[in-house]
Amino acid sequence: MSKKKLKNYDPTNLLSDIEKWPNPMFDKKHGYYLYVEGRARSNQTRKEHIVEYGHDLKVRDLELLPDGITNYFEYKKDPTYKNTYNYYLKRKGEDKGFVKVSIRINDKDPTYAWIKTVFITYKIK
């Protein structure tokens, strides 16, 4: 599987750069479609809506993401995986949780990154 690169990755501009992500990362008509690296796990407790896309790619359709998030987000280094960082985008409404976007930074060129996973969660780790 070829990885979809986020060229000139800048962690401070995630929200403003989101439309520049490779298609079909962003689709203005249908909302956000975000790649998951390899085969995604289905976990019903996360209340994910998962759809198929392409060969062995899984795509998660976060139907409320385009107008369902606030400008608030937290950015943390993943405690488990090397060169992986997590964004927690706050969803609108009380107790709606976060959209967690895990991004893997290229070891050799840190200006390149790719999406590993995207899902809805209620805890920041």
Regions flagged by a language model, labelled:
Residues 1-125:
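Ribonuclease/tRNase effector modules and their secretory precursors
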